[in-house]
A protein has these predicted regions:
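N-terminal leader segment of winged-helix/HTH proteins
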Residues: 1-33, 79, 139, 153
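C-terminal regulatory/oligomerization modules of transcriptional regulators
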Residues: 1-6, 127-153
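Alpha-helical hairpin
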Residues: 4-7, 35, 98, 124-125
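Pre-recognition alpha-helix immediately N-terminal to the DNA-recognition helix
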Residues: 10, 14, 21, 41-45, ...
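Alpha-helical linker/hinge and terminal dimerization helices associated
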Residues: 18, 22-26, 62, 105-124, ...
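N-terminal helix-turn-helix DNA-binding core of bacterial DNA-binding proteins
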Residues: 24-65, 151-153
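Residues within helix-turn-helix
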Residues: 55-56, 67, 74, 94
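Charged, amphipathic alpha-helical coiled-coil/dimerization segments
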Residues: 74-132
């Protein structure tokens, strides 16, 4: 195994373990109120899209299967936190968007969650390290697949 391959795999494993450790801590935090963390994830994704989002677009943000996402949307809709709306771009599709109650729940939980994220991340990282981590992770999420597969760096 080449040095580049070894360090890439070590970096991936460390990143994966760090994300899993932090995710467990954040999920266990007493900040969610009446929402499950994945329900909050949907509300958070919708908070940035007042015109609504297609359900298929939400799947990338929440990382659920299509049937799981459909059940989650139905639960949130039955609780009055989201509503369906016509998609002006495709009459066969619909969008989901926050209701006033959903926006309120998102803001309340989001404030507590954001504070807890900050506490968790700043416990061991300086501001400069957080900026560097953010920038590195942005690079990982914006790298075209083709260049990664071709081995370009």
């Amino acid at each position: 195994m080449s040095s580049r391959t070894r360090i890439a795999n070590e970096a991936w494993e460390t990143l994966f373990r760090a994300q899993a450790t932090i995710a467990r801590e954040l999920t266990a935090a007493d900040v969610w109120g009446e929402l499950a963390p994945h329900e909050y994830g949907v509300l958070y994704a919708l908070a940035g899209a007042p015109e609504g989002v297609r359900i298929s677009e939400l799947q990338g943000d929440v990382l659920l299967s299509q049937p799981g996402m459909s059940r989650l949307i139905a639960r949130l809709e039955s609780r009055g936190l989201i509503e369906r709306a016509d998609d002006p771009d495709d009459k066969r599709a619909c969008r989901v968007r926050l209701t006033d109650a959903g926006a309120s729940a998102q803001r309340q939980v989001g404030t507590r969650h954001g504070y807890h994220v900050a506490q968790t991340m700043t416990r061991t990282l300086s501001r400069e390290q957080l900026v560097q981590l953010r920038d590195l992770c942005r690079g990982l999420t914006t790298t075209p697949r083709g260049s990664m597969e071709a081995g370009a760096a």
